[in-house]
């Protein structure tokens, strides 16, 4: 079975900011079938939808900050529905919303609300994990609590293979665990060991990156620690 291979556009965000259309055309030229948005850089839904259609890219999904969606659920979700996205994803949690913090319950409740509204617009809400969800609350991983508390029909997984591994678990096992609930996957490889400044690599941690030989770093799929066939 062939699966469409897409690019998470956060990885080329600086290029998109300079030349949105040109960057999307280059993404297609590189052989990608689909894209996952991480911001629209001032472009409207109709423009983006038409551009993707012209280029031949599937506007498969979008990473949209949790707080942005909660501040205007109907308006924000409609933008991505109008583009033609099939999935809209909670991409990352800032410190106060993470497991072990009081606002983590707001994420669970918010996912129920957003998942229902996304479904009404013909989209599926997903959650993209990092490593910080792999802390146990009452003996159970927070990530599993989220997926247990929010029904599967309104919240699917977007398993990130790198971050599951960094969190101490087997990505393949997690994909099997959520069979039928894992329609989009982040394939990501890495080298080195879990460290304090890992998130500097994704533009979130502003602290200086580590310089030691075993520092954490991303690698092309198949060139790191992950066991990809």
What residue ranges belong to the model's regions?
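N-terminal pre-domain/capping segments
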Residues: 1-87, 156
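Glycine-centered flexibility sites
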Residues: 6, 31-34, 84, 115, ...
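Short glycine/serine/threonine-enriched helix-capping/active-site loop
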Residues: 7, 62, 90, 127, ...
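Acidic-and-aromatic substrate-binding clefts and catalytic sites of carbohydrate-active enzymes
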Residues: 13-18, 34-47, 64-72, 95-99, ...
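Short, glycine/charged-enriched secondary-structure capping and boundary segments
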Residues: 20-22, 49-52, 76-77, 102-105, ...
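Active-site acidic/histidine proton-transfer and metal-coordination neighborhood
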Residues: 25, 66-157, 177
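Acidic/histidine-rich catalytic cores of soluble enzymes
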Residues: 118-220
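Catalytic-core region of carbohydrate-active enzymes that cleave or remodel glycosidic bonds
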Residues: 227-229
